[in-house]
Every structure is written in C-alpha cells, then in structure tokens.
C-alpha cells in the first residue's frame, strides 16, 4: 500500500470513529440525518429519499439521494465520510437491476416506483443471530 492510500485509509477510520455506516445500495430508501448549522444554533435535518447512485472513491466516496418535494424532484449528493452526516438509516430495500438509476429523473408517479427486495426467512434469522 502506498503512502497516499495509507493516509486515505487513516482519514476514513478517523471519520468513522464512533459512527457506523450501514450497507445500502441503489434503489434503497434511506433517511440521511445531516448536521445543519444556522448562525450559532446546530440542529439535525432529516433527508429521506431513494439512493440513485453510489460512487466509491475511497475518502471521496459519495451517494446521491432523490426525493419528490411538493411535486418537484430534488437530488442531493452526500459525501459518505463527511463529518456533517449524523447518521444513515435504511428504511426500505429496493430491488433494482442497475447500479445507476438516472432513468428515474424522467419518470414520475407509478412508473417511478421501485419494487421492494424481499429477504428470505433464512437470511433474516441468520442476520438476527449475529
């Protein structure tokens, strides 16, 4: 491992100190809690939507979440290892066959729905035992 990769790995570990980032994939509905500073006040803002893309680039990894806000599509890019991210909660698993769901931008209503991924009972029991 070269020096840059080693430094990057140390920064990732420092960013994850005390935080856990759950496994999520494109198509999943997530709730991203973001620390927002307004003047001298700090609060947590929740942003819920569908993950349409994940970009894995080490420390520069990010993901795009899309939601419909009052009839208008809104996309927001989050840095995976940002100190502004308070937490990420996976609300629903989506069953998709693409890594990038940019086609959802042109769709609205029922055609923009994503099927839910059904997890078998064996996997659920194994996951709860771990």
Curated annotation (Swiss-Prot):
Signal sequence extent: none
Quote a single Gene Ontology cellular component term.
Answer: cytosolic large ribosomal subunit
Alphabetically sorted, this entry's keywords are:
Ribonucleoprotein, Ribosomal protein
GO MF annotations for this entry?
A: structural constituent of ribosome
Q: Which InterPro entries match?
A: Ribosomal_bL19, Ribosomal_bL19_CS, Ribosomal_bL19_sf, Translation_prot_SH3-like_sf
> Does the record's keyword annotation contain Ligase?
no
Disulfide bonding pattern of the chain: none
Listed GO biological process terms: translation
Q: What does this protein do?
A: This protein is located at the 30S-50S ribosomal subunit interface and may play a role in the structure and function of the aminoacyl-tRNA binding site.
**What family does the entry list?**
Belongs to the bacterial ribosomal protein bL19 family.
- What this protein is called in its record is Large ribosomal subunit protein bL19
User: Which gene name does the record give?
Assistant: rplS
